Regions:
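C-terminal substrate-binding subdomain of Rossmann-fold SDR/epimerase-dehydratase oxidoreductases
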Residues: 23-25, 31-151
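NAD(P)-dependent short-chain dehydrogenase/reductase
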Residues: 1-29, 35-37
Length: 151
């Protein structure tokens, strides 16, 4: 699995077992975005006024900086007794430690009005509501993606 897979798996495991074992330290912070915001960002950029776009080929977009601990706390506010265990995978931890914990998306905010609609609380509510309605053994179409940076 990938380094950021935990950010989706934690929700599936919360619904299935009320417990998740993180392979990253619980304080490992990474910039992330919920898929509905990522899709909306792409559409908004395509529909933006070209006269306002100065960085035509590269924009950072981000929504939130998350840790396994912060996601677990948000889940715990909705699922009493949820437990976060930690068993660090040194390889994935080293990768996560090499990534930025935040991105500067001020150009997107300034030039085409980018604003995420989901924060940790609204994303957690949406994820848990959707997973509770579906078979949690099946992958949901909404997922969390790591915010990206284009060169």
């Amino acid at each position: 699995g990938g380094t950021t897979d935990y950010a989706v798996a934690i929700y599936f495991e919360a619904v299935r077992h009320r417990r998740y074992c993180s392979y990253l330290r619980e304080d490992t912070a990474l910039a992330m975005m919920y898929m509905p915001d990522a899709l909306r960002a792409a559409v908004e950029l395509m529909e933006a006024d070209p006269q306002r776009l100065r960085h035509r080929n590269a924009y950072n977009v981000t929504a939130m900086t998350l840790t396994p601990r912060s996601i677990a706390a948000a889940i715990r506010r909705r699922i009493a007794g949820f437990v976060l265990d930690v068993a660090v995978d040194p390889r994935r931890q080293a990768i996560a430690d090499s990534w930025p914990d935040s991105l500067d998306d001020s150009a997107a905010r300034r030039e085409w009005g980018w604003r995420p609609q989901f924060d940790l609380e609204t994303m957690t509510g949406d994820m848990l509501a959707n997973l509770s309605k579906t078979d949690p053994t099946q992958k949901d179409s909404r997922c969390l993606v790591t915010s990206w940076e284009n060169d």
